[in-house]
Amino acid sequence: MPYNCCLPALSCRTSCSSRPCVPPSCHGCTLPGACNIPANVGNCNWFCEGSFNGNEKETMQFLNDRLASYMEKVRQLERENAELECRIQERNQQQDPLVCPAYQAYFRTIEELQQKILCSKSENARLVVQIDNAKLAADDFRTKYETELGLRQLVESDINGLRRILDELTLCKSDLEAQVESLKEELLCLKRNHEEEVNTLRCQLGDRLNVEVDAAPTVDLNRVLNETRCQYEAMVETNRREVEEWFTTQTEELNKQVVSSSEQLQSCQAEIIELRRTVNALEIELQAQHCMRNSLENTLTESEARYSSQLSQVQCLITNVESQLGEIRADLERQNQEYQVLLDVKARLECEINTYRGLLESEDCKLPCNPCATSNACGKPIGPCVSNPCVPCPPPAPCTPCVPRPRCGPCNSFVR
């Protein structure tokens, strides 16, 4: 890459006089980035006909080539940086519609599933509470059933005891009736015997003479027997009425107890039937709730497995994207470091250019006063591109002092 310096007046100056080179005070200065500068820079040789000597031209050419290489490297790195930024933007534009909406959809799905899981948990808790309440109600009904069953057994035992008493009373009644019949038969036998005895006595007395004797009055046996019979009949009737009344009262009490027990038994049976129906309904509902809970648990397990796999895939995608972002960030850091290095190099080059400009300006001030001459006294052109110095010239003619030239522009023109 040739380098064109914006110093047009330097190539058109001509003089037969000599000028000194760089002042000796600048010989030992160390410029930044000038460690590869040839050692012949700054030798105090005389310019021949206003041109640089060979060593200075080589040094300037070396510095120009170095500056051009640095600038080319800076431009190349800037182009690479722009290409990388374009690639990063393209990648972001390509990945934005793929990653972000998918993540949002996944997040919405995860939130919906979390809401469903919370609803299922609350529903399961509610069902567990209902099951516990049903179990408590079933336990209460079972306790009531056992209590009523105990009462029923007690009533049945009382009924059995009363039935035994009724059987005993029936036997006693039959015994008393048998005794009454036997007493009636005995009374009839006594009546017959008494009549027979009376008849026999009458027959015996009818054949005898009537002898009247003053004696105590005789006892009327018929009257005595009638009185005795009346007393026994009254006693039997009294006992019979008392036994009938006692039997009637006992029978009424037993009937009342049997009726109340039968009513209680019917109510207990109806309550037992209702409790059995309730227990069966609760068992059916419990089985249905168990089936529903199992199905919900299976659905929850499947959903967790499915969404865990999807979440692992999304996590892998996120990991890949993060690794790519890490690589891009590392690349950007590396480019930033290179850019900082290039900025430092650019700063050093600018310092060198300023130094060279100062040197050139100092050299310009020391050139002859005739800036418009294009050839030396020997008739040869002069300029920065002359490779060989001119032959010795005759003594120069006196000239007027040169006027200081304005500064030239910075060397910023590069031609590929």
Curated annotation (Swiss-Prot):
Native species of this protein?
Mus musculus (Mouse)
Q: What is this protein called?
A: Keratin, type I cuticular Ha1
**Annotated stretches, region: Head:** 2-56
Q: Which GO terms describe its cellular component?
A: intermediate filament
Q: Which domain of life is it from?
A: Eukaryota
Q: Where is this region: Coil 1B?
A: 103-203
Q: Which family does it belong to?
A: Belongs to the intermediate filament family.
The IF rod domain is annotated at: 56-367
| UniProt keywords, alphabetically | Coiled coil, Intermediate filament, Keratin
Q: Does the keyword Ubl conjugation apply?
A: no
Which portions of the sequence form the region Coil 2?
220-363
